[in-house]
């Protein structure tokens, strides 16, 4: 089924423009499709606080609680922004001109539910900031469907690019410290 939402169609149109210009050899371009990224910004004014993990870490610092606006059963592929930057740097500095197609999914290739990510944030708060924030789930759905998401990112290892899951934990700890320091209410 096709997604006709303006967000999706505008992104797909942009992808087509990049790939067409690449095919015409006007640019050397690739398309990165980003999964659910998170990480500390350079400035607190950065437009990043609507990212799920960033929002939850900010909540932990400001409110000392985590509030989900869903059941939390949704599966997502989470990746740290530092790993995204590293992958982009590899593409910029490497020779990937011979690739058949320039579409790459940037993700870890494994899923976690939103609720499990919130629980991980609770655990990392305890470890990093010595506080365990409460977790509130806004509502439960009648569905018990916990089918896993498989965000296909297998092209990266085939190019010799490997991701390290421990970097997600490091980034999460850094984000929690950033939020605690930046938003002034140390946990």
Regions found by a protein language model. Give the residues of each.
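Structural element of the ATP-grasp superfamily
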Residues: 18, 56, 155-157
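Short, hydrophobic alpha-helix immediately C-terminal to the catalytic nucleophile
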Residues: 15-19, 54, 89, 115
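Glycine-rich "substrate-gating" loop/helix at the edge of Rossmann-like oxidoreductase active sites
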Residues: 4, 35-49, 70-82, 110
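Oxidoreductase cofactor-interface core, primarily capturing Rossmann-like NAD(P)-dependent enzymes
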Residues: 27-32, 40-43, 47-55, 60-65
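C-terminal substrate-binding subdomain of Rossmann-fold SDR/epimerase-dehydratase oxidoreductases
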Residues: 60-64, 68-187
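Short, conserved glycine- and acidic-residue-centered signature motifs
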Residues: 10, 49, 149
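Active-site Tyr-X1-5-Lys
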Residues: 2-30, 35, 58-62
